[in-house]
């Protein structure tokens, strides 16, 4: 007989963020499984541009958990964190002798889930 604990998970999603999903995953791997407050401190002091976007989404997920599910922010941890590839913006860079080189500007969708300890 197995005992299952009913765990509420609340999530927040940031869509069409103009950053490479590869660079976003580098930061998400650092906060996955950490406590909410600890993850905020890590994001505050990491030198990457993506940290501000992830911090905003994490705060939104915590606010959703507190408001919608009645969970305590001090008891939350990052249960789920992943970045999916979004649509790529395609642009052209003019080059010498009438040529044009394609430029691909990637976007991503960031999903963060928080649960209570």
UniProtKB/Swiss-Prot annotation:
One Gene Ontology cellular component term attached to this UniProt record is: chloroplast
Per the record, the similarity remark reads: Belongs to the universal ribosomal protein uL22 family.
**Subunit structure and binding partners:** Part of the 50S ribosomal subunit.
- Is Chloroplast a UniProt keyword of this protein? yes
Task: Note the Gene3D superfamilies from the entry.
Answer: Ribosomal protein L22/L17
* Entry superkingdom: Eukaryota
Under PROSITE patterns, the record lists:
RIBOSOMAL_L22
Q: What is the recorded name of this protein?
A: Large ribosomal subunit protein uL22c
- Name the job this protein performs: This protein binds specifically to 23S rRNA.
Keyword list (alphabetical) reads:
Chloroplast, Plastid, Ribonucleoprotein, Ribosomal protein, RNA-binding, rRNA-binding
Q: Which processes are annotated in GO (biological process)?
A: translation
Q: Where in the cell is it found?
A: Plastid, Chloroplast
């Amino acid at each position: 007989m197995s005992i299952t604990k009913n765990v509420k998970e609340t999530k927040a999603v940031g869509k069409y963020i103009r950053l490479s999903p590869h660079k976003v995953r580098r930061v998400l791997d650092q906060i996955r499984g950490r406590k909410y407050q600890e993850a905020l401190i890590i994001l505050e002091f990491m030198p990457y541009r993506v940290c501000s976007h992830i911090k905003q989404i994490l705060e939104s997920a915590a606010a959703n958990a507190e408001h919608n599910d009645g969970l305590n922010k001090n008891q939350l941890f990052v249960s789920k964190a992943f970045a999916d590839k979004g649509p790529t913006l395609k642009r052209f860079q003019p080059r010498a002798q009438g040529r044009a080189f394609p430029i691909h500007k990637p976007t991503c969708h960031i999903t963060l889930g928080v649960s209570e300890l």
